[in-house]
Amino acid sequence: MFDQTAWGWLPSLYLLLGGLAGGLTLVSSIVRLCSGGMSNETCGPRSLGSFPATSSCIALAALAVGLACLVSELDNPDQALAMHLSFSNAGSWMTYGAWTLVAGCVVFAANAVLATPRTRAALLALFPHVGSRTIVIAGNAAMAAAGIVGLAIAAYTGMLLRSAGSIPMWDTPLLPVLFTLSSCSMGAEVAALLLCWGGEAAKGTRQKTSLQSAVTAYRAVSIGAMAIALLEAGVLMAYMVGRTSASPLGADMTRSLVEGELAPWFWVGAVALGIVVPLACEAVATCSPQGTGMGGPSLRGALSAAQPGTRAAKTVARPIAAIVAAACSVVGSFALRCIVVAVGVHEPLTAAQLVAASLGIS
């Protein structure tokens, strides 16, 4: 039944990397916007430590590796350049995607440069006449643009499959929605982990304030991740129900996911690792009274214990729950894309369609 499918694991990988890049950039931009963007005084992010720079660089690297995987599958890599130079099929989703990915590379790179303290300092040293205020404006503009392009890339990974046509499991508007939510879920879990590991407190008397800002951002992202996971579960259920009633082939493919050869990938990978475990980890990490999480202190616990000059106040805690949630979310999202690609089987042609095709009749 699945012999029609020529795609292996590599397409699922670059769909995953594109979704991770888009989702992480979108979540990071929202967090930075809610935290005040870049400050005029320091020409840097406010109270978020290394999170803006780290998240921007990870998103850029994920997009670059995903593009490399995509180009590696082309028989002639020059075809990738031809997509941008030819406007003969400008209305296709492939062309839209090609330009969106190029825009993503440019905007993500600018965002990473302007979010990293050393590169900002280098820019000011090279162009002293520009001034810190201009860098702040450019950084906030790049942050906003990166968030918009990130959302477009996350949605495009689903639109690319839907545009194939005549494939029951892909021919639904719920697929782009599902992939977008999956990408945002990944981005939120990775962002929560980065806030734990990279949210260092400011020095001196401002240390407590910076810890409070990091705790607030972490808690907001964790709650957002739980909400996105619940939405993803609902859309996944609607997708499965809708594909069951779409056609006999759609019903067969859905059955293969629920109780057939792809069932372990679906239940263990997409559902358990992709949704249930991250949801449980975030619930434990955010609802625990002392913030003990799963084997380690949370940011809330670190805040209550931190005092200026103490070791606890020098770094934000690193709960194991955030590590488990981020890892499971990425693995589960990869499993989701693998099974969606695997069930991408064309409807069999009828005799009338074969005759029409042989006569060149559309």
Regions flagged by a language model, labelled:
Residues 1-11, 40-46, 74-95, 157-178, ...:
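Membrane-interface interhelical loops and short amphipathic "cap" helices
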Residues 3-6, 16-20:
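Short, extreme N-terminal leader segments that mark the start of a protein/domain
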Residues 8-9, 43-60, 94-99, 133-144, ...:
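Alpha-helical transmembrane segments and their helix-start/interface "positive-inside/aromatic belt" motifs
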Residues 15-17, 34, 39-40, 102, ...:
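Long, contiguous internal "core" modules enriched in hydrophobic/ aromatic residues
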Residues 20, 24-107:
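Membrane helical hairpin/interfacial module
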Residues 324-343:
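Final/C-terminal transmembrane alpha-helix of multipass membrane proteins
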